[in-house]
Design a protein with these regions (language model features):
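Short, conserved secondary-structure transition motifs
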Residues: 57-61, 136-140, 196-205
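Acidic/polar loop patches that form or flank catalytic/metal-binding clefts of enzymes
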Residues: 63-67, 125-129, 184-192
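FAD-binding beta-loop-beta segment adjacent to the flavin cofactor pocket
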Residues: 131-151, 156
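Extended charged low-complexity segments that act as oligomerization/scaffolding linkers
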Residues: 7, 64-67, 116-120, 179-182
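Conserved FAD/dinucleotide-binding core of flavoprotein oxidoreductases
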Residues: 78-134, 156-167, 185
Length: 338
């Protein structure tokens, strides 16, 4: 028996039956429709240890405080049992600590997070509140099961070290629009299978990319980092996608562009490897035309000098000044309300 989903809604003490061709599960980690109702299997990413996160909102205490801490990038810092993030917004600073309950207790990590906040941002304990999030690492075996499609956390999640969770949500929405537009909403099972293959290939690739940030670290100063760098066997599943790829299946899917995913072919590892101080195993320059390398190097030096000169000049606004003048139109009151 095909267990298609029909929803009963409770409205004004009345039960209303709703039948639809497609239900999109946006119920977050609960995955009420995809997992709880249809029983779609959840597959964990065991090589990612972090399963908890603290978060807090730090107020700007003064104009000077805002000028000091507001900038245009998200900062990530390695911590004792995970990593901490800083996201300076217009009205506040968003901070958090992604950590693992396998290696530390809350009464250890929370004081560490509090000390970090108070030292980094010069705030007192009563000027912020800390919340907790339980992280559910992994994905469902099928994103699209019968007439239910999980998008966002209801389908899967990878910790936000590289914002890949947001990207998979974006890509699955575009993929759905593409599939539905091909034959005016008529979708077959094989098209759902192709969708699921592309979604799974993408999220697994992103999880491995994130895992390499830990695997290539040189830290061994506590149980958490020793597990990440010396104990965890990443290679057991690291290249399972290449083993599981069925050539005919990919060729069929590519004819409809349903197998197209973001770049998850691990080329990004070059930058992680270089950042960790590892010398690349081949001479990448040998593959390049010498004249091309000289041209690129000169262009980069020219650009770098121009940027440096501008940043050091009085003409360069601070990030706060730029937002105020060019985004919020110089209206301080309006800027404060947004």
């Amino acid at each position: 028996e095909i267990k298609q989903l029909a929803v009963r809604l409770i409205e004004d003490k009345r039960t209303i039956g709703v039948i639809g061709d497609l239900f999109i599960d946006c119920t977050g980690f609960s995955s009420i429709l995809l997992e709880n109702y249809l029983g779609t299997r959840f597959i964990k990413f065991d090589d990612l240890a972090n399963d908890k996160a603290f978060y807090a909102r730090i107020p700007y205490l003064s104009q000077e405080h805002r000028e000091k801490h507001m900038h245009n990038v998200t900062d990530c810092e390695a911590a004792e049992n995970g990593w901490m993030w800083t996201i300076p917004l217009w009205n506040r600073i968003g901070v958090g600590y992604c950590w693992s309950s396998r290696f530390a207790m809350e009464n250890e990590t929370k004081p560490e997070f509090e000390r970090w906040i108070e030292e980094k941002f010069d705030v007192a304990p009563g000027e912020y509140e800390i919340g907790t999030i339980d992280i559910k690492h992994g994905y469902h075996e099928k994103a699209w099961n019968l007439n239910v499609l999980g998008i966002g956390l209801s389908y899967g999640f990878v910790e936000p070290l590289e914002s890949t969770g947001l990207l998979t949500t974006h890509e699955n929405i575009l993929r759905l629009v593409d599939v539905l537009s091909r034959r005016q909403g008529y979708v077959t099972q094989i098209e759902r299978d192709w969708f699921n293959y592309a979604a799974q290939r993408e999220v697994i690739g992103f999880s491995k990319f994130v895992a390499m940030h830990y695997a290539l670290s040189m830290r061994t100063d506590n149980p958490y980092w020793r597990w990440c760098t010396q104990r965890n066997e990443y290679m057991q599943e690291q290249f399972d996608m290449s083993v599981r790829v069925v050539d005919n299946y990919e060729r069929m899917g590519s004819s409809l562009d349903l197998d197209q995913t973001m770049d998850v072919n691990m080329n990004g590892l070059n930058y992680i490897v270089a950042g960790m101080g590892v010398k690349l195993g081949r001479d990448w320059l040998n593959d390049r035309d010498p004249d091309e390398l000289v041209f690129v190097d000169n262009a980069h030096r020219t650009y770098e000098k121009e940027v440096y000169d501008f940043v050091c000049s009085e003409e360069c606004p601070s990030h706060y000044e730029y937002l105020k003048e060019y985004i919020y139109g110089g209206d301080e009151l309006r800027a404060e309300l947004i």
